[in-house]
Amino acid sequence: MSCGKTHGRHENCVCDAVEKILAEQEAVEEQCPTGCYTNLLNPTIAGKDTIPFLVFDKKGGLFSTFGNVGGFVDDMQCFESIFFRVEKLCDCCATLSILRPVDVKGDTLSVCHPCDPDFFGLEKTDFCIEVDLGCFCAIQCLSPELVDRTSPHKDKKHHHNG
């Protein structure tokens, strides 16, 4: 798939992918017992209703935006994120919620690269951005397990024999 080529009803492969992501999320949120979209989200696992994803511009760069600008919500600081959840889709325009990147302690990170060594997981937020999906050339879905990921036991990494 390359930019600018026709890929279905929306004539944009990113639009088609986001439409499928939204359908999967909605199927889980409605607790649909039988559905066609079960490869990423499992309706029997409570709380897993988000397929996080990255989007890339037409030059291959990661799209990023900011959440909690001014630091007005809760005790969260302003953060930059490259991680999104689709909330609404109309034609090729989408409302994306900004997922908050956190470290293993649950502290807010500003993440501009998915392989940042401090990045551990994602938290859903109420911060949203409206985007024209036609401005993007690629999308990468990530594991739903990243959202509300629980901290591993610290004892697992270092074992000392007495």
Swiss-Prot record:
Where in or outside the cell it occurs: the entry states: Spore coat
Q: Mention one GO biological process in which this protein takes part, according to its record.
A: sporulation resulting in formation of a cellular spore
The entry sums up its family as follows: To B.subtilis CotZ.
Subunit structure and binding partners: Disulfide cross-linked either to itself or to CotZ.
Provide the leader sequence positions: none
Q: Which UniProt keywords apply?
A: Disulfide bond, Sporulation
Q: Give the organism the record lists.
A: Bacillus subtilis (strain 168)
Pfam family of the protein (one): Spore-coat_CotZ
Where primarily located? other
Report the superkingdom from the record.
Answer: Bacteria
UniProt-recorded name of the protein? Spore coat protein Y
